[in-house]
Amino acid sequence: MRLFVGLGNPGARYAANRHNIGFMALDAVARRHRAAPWRRKFQGEASEAVIGTERVLLLKPETYMNESGRAVAEAQRFYKIALDDVVVFHDELDLAPAKVRVKKGGGNAGHNGLRSITAQCGNEYWRVRLGIGHPGDKALVHAYVLNDFAKAERPWVDDLCDALADHAALLAAGEDANFQNRIHLALQGRGWDDVKRVGDKQA
């Protein structure tokens, strides 16, 4: 079994925030792969799906971002899931909008959800880094991630979540490089390879 974790904050107030793109991604995967109904478990919402040929537990921690690791650790212990089989979808300030990178281990880049998971579970889990861009000034970061995606951003967010769901079987099978490439090609095909189109002024 693999564990797919989406990071975000619970409740309607945060649902459309940039910080919640991990929840959005996991919801898209659950819909596409006809996952079981969400239920309250492991200090969050949990579901199960067969993605490709793999049985996958889907988890959205409801502990708030800073305590996400408690939910992940509980689910990991219950099912005896190896850390190498844990995949975390999260927002990434250091990537341009609509860019996706997959990596194992590494630093937390100031992300409190990752920091909590690392503290509770260890560092060698997989990250699916979902680019949301940077506001350009460190002082603006808190407000930026806790604000909703702008109306003009929603098309790329929807296309990104669709692409993640379309190719989730590759990720479940451990084909991380192939998964990342397929996402890139899918978004390129929709025109999102031009960062200026999605408002990224850093590139």
UniProtKB/Swiss-Prot annotation:
Where is coiled-coil annotated?
none
Annotated catalysed reactions: an N-acyl-L-alpha-aminoacyl-tRNA + H2O = an N-acyl-L-amino acid + a tRNA + H(+)
What is the designated name of this protein? Peptidyl-tRNA hydrolase
Q: What class of enzyme is it?
A: hydrolase
User: Is Isomerase found in the keyword set?
Assistant: no
Q: Which family does it belong to?
A: Belongs to the PTH family.
What InterPro entries does UniProt report for this protein, alphabetically?
A: Pept_tRNA_hydro, Pept_tRNA_hydro_CS, Pept_tRNA_hydro_sf
GO molecular function annotations of the record: peptidyl-tRNA hydrolase activity; tRNA binding
A Pfam short name: Pept_tRNA_hydro
- Could you tell me the gene encoding this protein? pth
Gene Ontology CC annotations of this record:
cytoplasm
Task: State which Enzyme Commission number(s) the record gives.
Answer: 3.1.1.29
Record note on quaternary structure = Monomer.
Instruction: Cite the binding residues for tRNA.
Output: Y14, Y64, N66, N112
